[in-house]
């Protein structure tokens, strides 16, 4: 079966935004205008096509990114048929892992901002993630019909707060209830949308006289930005030549793909004014799979060797699994982005990360929650594979003959844990299965059993994250569970360098005894420029002259690692440590691996006193948006929670207060901040760093360990 759409007419895009910027409504309109969904889904009614989990429809927020394949021929049919794969991403900070995951497989993004609230805290998080993966993007300023909406103010905020160069290719005609349409700065025409067909068509008119000067000014800025793309355009521009529409678009496209500029458009998705032009901008400015650098990976047989795969059907097959979803009817769906080659149903591939073969049964292409079965997928496609046995998010699927491990995704460590207990004996087994499936879908969610209490502990990125997972357990797997109080993931570290400690374990009372003896030099872990500690143990062996035989060295390392897991001050894991074994002694008969492991563990335990052991607590970056009347209360409350106010600024919706607050003080904050402000303040929080916990907290924790 040949390719139906040439790969240069593919666009793999994500729609990213802050909560409530109108992202799901925008995606919904895209589906409507591309002819896939005949009745527009509204988030307000809980009926949007991409919000396909029950919880999303109830809460009106998007949690899972559904991948949807659509086709577009231009707002006036001016293009050949383009295949646009849209990945809807969540905007809630507890789900940044989903955003990170989808950005990893996108070629371009449409970042949606609200015309009233502009650049919000989460927008910065999403923007940073897009920078990390070098994703070209365009900006869509939505909700221009809302009170206080101002397109150019939001453009200014993008420049100032996100440090990027936005280039408006449109201007708004009117705003708030008088928002009428856009000025197309490339064609220099005013655009008014047709209400009778829900904004599918528009008419072009002359630009209103009072906006002409502004339009001229922004058009010349836009042309200058386009001319900087290459020498040829620059020379033409400097010599006073008029750039053609094609040249302007080509220049802007080249610079957008290089992540130098961000074209900006505006509209109101809810009022059906502007989404077809957002789609046109996707075609005009965002890259095809062939226009981004080839993806790189390592050879599983030789990790030093870097291989690359180009977006071509002729290269060996390679794809990245970026999302696992459990479907009640077909079982596990593995969403994959194909980077190179062709995959047909029935083929066998290798999961190069785990070294396991998988046979591909059925393949489907998703349209939000409906699916069409397909026989093959090619470079640039996004498809869901059914029946994969052992694939987790971030795994590479590739041809058996030419294996490659594509870049791994980094998943953040969870910061909050709660204990869950099944309500009845019957729920016990079901809960184990349910948690296993949820953990397979979401790598930022962990499940473990507390060895001392036997409780099942689940950990995640925030209270909302865990609430929703427990809710899904109830709905999808019929498991009723009781939830404990949230627990903070504390950590430990040491503060002294080059501490030399002796560990000696001797049991000799006749017969075969135990003898292990080592001297270890401990030092503090390295810290990166952001103040984050390098995790894990950096172990070196400097023993000379065989005073400790080689075969016991791994046992010493193991002893240190095991003690690190159990901590030295209050029973929390030591997050980073450098250890060098440099001396010791052994006994011909009584020494064994066990004895050296215990000796090393005993030496590590002494770090509490000798190494200046400290307990660290997670500090969260909190942003509260509150009307001015409640600002005093909110700030007083943050101070009571041991928060450090980092700064404040004005926004349309009131004051934005930025603070760093220990996670342990933030439980139940959602309810508190609402009651303080009569429901008018909102907040977002994300993990910032680990910092030393105050003495009174450490005392309580040590007592708890008993």
Swiss-Prot record:
User: Cellular component GO terms, alphabetically?
Assistant: cytoplasm
Its chief place of residence is cytoplasm
Q: Check the record and name the CDD domains matching this protein.
A: EF-G, EFG_III, EFG_mtEFG1_IV, EFG_mtEFG_C, EFG_mtEFG_II
- GO terms, biological process: ribosome disassembly
Protein keywords: Cytoplasm, Elongation factor, GTP-binding, Nucleotide-binding, Protein biosynthesis
User: Where in this chain does the record put each tr-type G domain?
Assistant: 8-290
Family affiliation: Belongs to the TRAFAC class translation factor GTPase superfamily. Classic translation factor GTPase family. EF-G/EF-2 subfamily.
Role according to the record: Catalyzes the GTP-dependent ribosomal translocation step during translation elongation. During this step, the ribosome changes from the pre-translocational (PRE) to the post-translocational (POST) state as the newly formed A-site-bound peptidyl-tRNA and P-site-bound deacylated tRNA move to the P and E sites, respectively. Catalyzes the coordinated movement of the two tRNA molecules, the mRNA and conformational changes in the ribosome.
Q: What is this protein called?
A: Elongation factor G
Which species is this record about? Stutzerimonas stutzeri (strain A1501)
Lineage, highest ranks first: Bacteria, Pseudomonadati, Pseudomonadota, Gammaproteobacteria, Pseudomonadales
């Amino acid at each position: 079966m040949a390719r139906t759409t040439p790969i240069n007419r593919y666009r793999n895009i994500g729609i990213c935004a802050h909560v409530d910027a109108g992202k799901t409504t925008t995606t919904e309109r895209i589906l409507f205008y591309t002819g896939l969904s005949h009745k527009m889904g509204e988030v307000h009614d809980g009926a949007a096509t991409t919000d396909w989990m029950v919880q999303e429809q109830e809460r009106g927020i998007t949690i899972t990114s559904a991948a949807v394949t659509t086709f577009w021929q231009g707002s006036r049919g001016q293009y050949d048929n383009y295949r646009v794969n849209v990945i809807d991403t969540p905007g809630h900070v507890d789900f940044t892992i989903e955003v990170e995951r989808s950005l990893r497989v996108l070629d371009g993004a449409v970042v949606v901002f609200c015309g009233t609230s502009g650049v919000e805290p989460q927008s910065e998080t999403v923007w940073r993630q897009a920078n990390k993966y070098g994703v070209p993007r365009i900006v869509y300023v939505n909700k221009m019909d809302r009170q206080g909406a101002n397109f150019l103010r939001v453009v200014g905020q993008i420049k100032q707060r996100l440090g990027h160069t936005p280039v408006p290719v449109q201007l708004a005609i009117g705003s708030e209830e008088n928002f009428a349409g856009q000025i197309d700065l490339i064609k220099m025409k005013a655009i008014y949308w047709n209400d009778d067909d829900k904004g599918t068509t528009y008419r072009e008119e002359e630009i209103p006289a009072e906006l002409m000067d502004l339009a001229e000014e922004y058009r010349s800025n836009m042309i200058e930005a386009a001319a900087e793309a290459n020498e040829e355009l620059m020379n033409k521009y400097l010599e006073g030549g008029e750039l053609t529409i094609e040249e302007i678009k080509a220049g802007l496209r080249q610079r957008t793909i290089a992540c130098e500029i961000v074209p900006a458009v505006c509209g109101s998705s809810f009022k059906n004014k502007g989404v077809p032009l957002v789609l046109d901008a996707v075609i005009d400015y965002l890259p095809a799979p062939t226009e981004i650098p080839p993806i790189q990976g390592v050879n599983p047989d030789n990790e030093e060797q870097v291989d690359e795969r180009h977006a071509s059907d002729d290269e060996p097959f390679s794809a990245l699994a970026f999302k696992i979803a459990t479907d009640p009817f077909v079982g596990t769906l593995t969403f994959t982005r194909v980077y190179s080659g062709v995959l047909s149903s029935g083929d066998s591939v290798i999961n190069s990360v785990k070294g396991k073969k998988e046979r591909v049964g059925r393949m489907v292409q998703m349209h939000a929650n409906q699916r069409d079965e397909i026989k093959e997928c090619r470079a640039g496609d996004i498809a869901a594979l059914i029946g994969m046995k052992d694939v987790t998010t971030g795994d590479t699927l590739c041809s058996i003959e030419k294996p490659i491990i594509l870049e791994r995704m980094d998943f953040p460590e969870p910061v909050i844990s709660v204990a869950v207990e099944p309500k009845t004996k019957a729920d016990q087994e079901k809960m184990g299965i349910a948690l296993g499936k949820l953990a397979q879908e979401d790598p930022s969610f962990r499940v473990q059993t507390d060895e001392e209490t036997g409780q099942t502990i689940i950990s995640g990125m925030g209270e909302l994250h865990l609430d929703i997972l427990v809710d899904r357990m109830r709905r999808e797997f019929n498991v009723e569970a009781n939830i404990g109080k949230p627990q903070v993931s504390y950590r430990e570290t040491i503060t002294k360098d080059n501490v030399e400690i002796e560990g000696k374990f001797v049991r000799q009372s006749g017969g075969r005894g135990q003898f292990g003896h080592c001297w270890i030099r401990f030092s503090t872990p390295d810290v990166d420029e952001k103040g984050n500690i390098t995790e894990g143990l950096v172990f070196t062996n400097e023993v000379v002259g065989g005073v400790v035989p080689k075969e016991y060295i791994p046992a010493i390392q193991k002893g240190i690692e095991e003690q690190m897991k159990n901590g030295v001050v209050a029973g929390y894991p030591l997050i980073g440590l450098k250890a060098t074994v440099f001396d010791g002694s052994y006994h011909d008969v009584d020494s064994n691996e066990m004895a050296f492991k215990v000796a090393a563990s005993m030496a590590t335990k002494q770090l509490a006193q000798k190494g200046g052991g400290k307990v660290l607590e997670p500090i969260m970056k909190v942003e509260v948006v509150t009307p001015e009347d409640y600002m005093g209360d909110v700030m007083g409350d943050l101070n009571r929670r041991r928060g450090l106010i980092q700064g404040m600024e004005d926004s349309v919706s009131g004051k934005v207060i930025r603070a760093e607050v220990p996670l342990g003080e933030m439980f139940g904050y959602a309810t508190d901040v609402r009651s303080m402000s009569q429901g008018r303040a909102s907040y977002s929080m994300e993990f910032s760093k680990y910092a030393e916990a105050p003495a009174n907290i450490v005392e309580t924790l040590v007592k708890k360990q008993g």
